[in-house]
Swiss-Prot record:
Pathway: One-carbon metabolism; tetrahydrofolate interconversion. Catalyzes the oxidation of 5,10-methylenetetrahydrofolate to 5,10-methenyltetrahydrofolate and then the hydrolysis of 5,10-methenyltetrahydrofolate to 10-formyltetrahydrofolate. NADP(+) binds at residues 169-171, 196, 237. The keyword NADP applies. Its EC number is 1.5.1.5, 3.5.4.9. This is Bifunctional protein FolD. SUPFAM superfamilies: Aminoacid dehydrogenase-like, N-terminal domain (SSF53223), NAD(P)-binding Rossmann-fold domains (SSF51735). NCBIfam families: PRK14193.1. GO terms for biological process: L-histidine biosynthetic process; methionine biosynthetic process; purine nucleotide biosynthetic process; tetrahydrofolate interconversion. Homodimer.
Length: 300
């Protein structure tokens, strides 16, 4: 058996094409969606990540609002920048790029974000709505990586309802919110959330119809851990040194040999990562459409 590849690049491209149509409709109404980013410092990885987001915006027709602060910015500086993004009518949604410099309370800064402009879907208010809203349409933004995982599974027609999903990793950006999303009525998966203290992790993974590896341990998930035909999504990233070249490279949580056992496999890179970026754009478009509906209601 060779796994069907869950191609995140192709799937994200399809999502962005659909978003571009919706954005054109918004622009025809005089509403221009805008994504803001707040970057503090000169971390090369963060700069590259933010630049990628703005390239995505240009591709689909979303305006970019970029706020960069120096590495020696104070918490007061960051607070002021967030307040300005909250009040800027050109900003439909925005993100605060993490990590922030030492000495700045990240949680306190993130809680300052206007929940209606939370493009990452990770504000406590929006996560709380995900907890409470077990059925019906969610109008608040969803965490981007979990939403991207679900979108990709659905587009490849991988069954979710009634399936046993094992999530390896309990982080705020993937593991915990993914469990909440997959157990909503309408998706109806049964989710086991595992972590570093889970007893017999191998046995838990082997029971899964769908495995999501998001722990950041290189090649943790071995082929003998995976039930034949299971869908496996590789989310975690680890920087390792290539023994042949001596150069650092990025690798995922899933051993490449899993492709010979799994029914579906998302590669890493080119798997879930592009879908995360596409869902960020989707959150901005959804917020713009919400604003358009509110404006129409006010006009009567």
């Amino acid at each position: 058996m060779t796994a069907v590849v869950l191609d995140g690049v192709a799937t994200a491209s399809a999502v962005k094409s659909e978003l571009a149509v919706r954005i054109r409709a918004l622009r025809e109404q005089g509403l221009v969606p805008g994504l803001g980013t707040l970057l503090v410092g000169d971390d090369p990885g963060s700069r590259a990540y933010v630049a990628g987001k703005h390239r995505d915006c240009a591709e689909v027709g979303i305006e970019s609002i970029r706020v960069d602060l120096p590495a020696d910015a104070t918490e007061a500086d960051v607070r002021l920048a967030i307040e300005r993004l909250n009040s800027d009518p050109a900003v439909t949604g925005y993100i605060v790029q993490l990590p922030l410099p030492a000495g700045i309370d990240e949680n306190a800064m993130l809680e300052l974000i206007d929940p209606s402009k939370d493009a990452d879907g990770l504000h406590p208010t929006n996560l709380g709505r995900l907890v409470l809203g077990v059925q019906g349409e969610l109008t608040s933004p969803l965490p981007c990586t979990p939403a991207g995982i679900v979108e990709m599974l659905q587009r490849y027609e991988v069954p979710i309802a009634g399936q046993h999903v094992v999530v390896v990793g309990r982080g705020l950006t993937v593991g915990r919110p993914l469990g909440l999303l997959l157990t909503r009525k309408g998706l109806d998966a049964t989710v086991t959330l595992t972590h570093s203290r889970t007893r017999d992790l191998e046995q838990e993974v082997r029971r899964a119809d769908i495995v999501v590896a998001a722990v950041g341990v290189a090649h943790l998930i071995k082929p003998e851990w995976v039930k034949p035909g299971a869908a496996v999504l590789d989310v975690g990233i680890t920087r390792v040194v290539d023994p042949e070249t001596g150069k650092a490279r990025l690798t995922g949580d899933v051993d490449p040999a899993v492709a010979e056992v799994a029914g579906h496999l998302s590669p890493n890179p080119r798997g879930v990562g592009p879908m995360t970026r596409a869902m960020l754009l989707a959150n901005v478009v959804q917020a713009a459409e919400r604003d358009a509906r509110l404006a129409a209601e006010l006009r009567g």
